[in-house]
Amino acid sequence: MYTPPVQRRNFLTSTLGAALMSTMAASGNRADAAQPTGAKVAPEFYVWRQYILKNGTQPRRLADFLQNAAIPALNRLGHTPIGVFEVMAGLPSPTLFVLTPSSSLESLLAIEAGLERDDAFMRAADPYLNAPATDPVYLRQELSLLTAFPNVPRVEVPAATAAKGPRLFELRTYESHNERAHRAKVRMFTDMGEVDIFRKVGLTPVFFARTFVGPRMPSLVYMLVHENMAGREKSWDAFRTSPDWKTLAATPGFSDAEIVTNITTVFLRPAAYSQI
């Protein structure tokens, strides 16, 4: 959502910011723009934002801001779909996550200016923007900048979203002990067929991404969607017993013991107004 100007300037002048700008420049236009036949879809960038809240009025006030001010304005700026997720298990509650996709880093950095020029947003966001320090809308925010895997280049909206059907989201973070190990794990998903195995056994992706900026690096993050917990267990059981997975996991240099130091799982449910 909102990026303070000083943080934006610091980011742009950093070495990492320059590298990401180069990546962005090479990524081209949105995937839904006209593409040459056979052209690859450029991977998206994601802002993954965590709001830490306290019980009381904060969850309702933040939801009002997101639903009535932020999400409509972000959609007008071309950022869609916006995912909003509430924690079911794995983290303290109340905690809210917001996923903002973008075709480029440049468009993410332009969000602040775009919102400030949007009169409808400024009116709808007034209770949020003018909340006093003694009664804030949230305790704090934490965010990560992610870049999508080339073989899962865009958010895949679950089929159940349109009908507001049941959706259990599973957010998984894989940490590695160094950059080489991290690249090896990413390669398993992007080049060695692990995502294909997921799909084959019924593990349905929402997104797969590398963490470019954020905590617990080097790491990758992905989200799956299930109908319910029983469906999740069935799909994971099928994955663990898959001959394809057993062969891949036994590849020298690619076992979890060699390249993954920690896996974190958080279960989420969609907010009523989530677009994912």
What is the predicted role of each segment?
Residues L20-A25:
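Hydrophobic h-region of N-terminal signal peptides that target proteins for export
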Residues N29-V41, I71-F97, S103, G193-V221, ...:
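Short, glycine- and small/hydrophobic-rich beta-strand elements in well-ordered beta-sheets
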Residues I52-L62, N68-R76, T80-A162, S176-N178, ...:
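Hydrophobic, ordered structural segments
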Residues A148-M229:
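Surface-exposed interaction/gating patches
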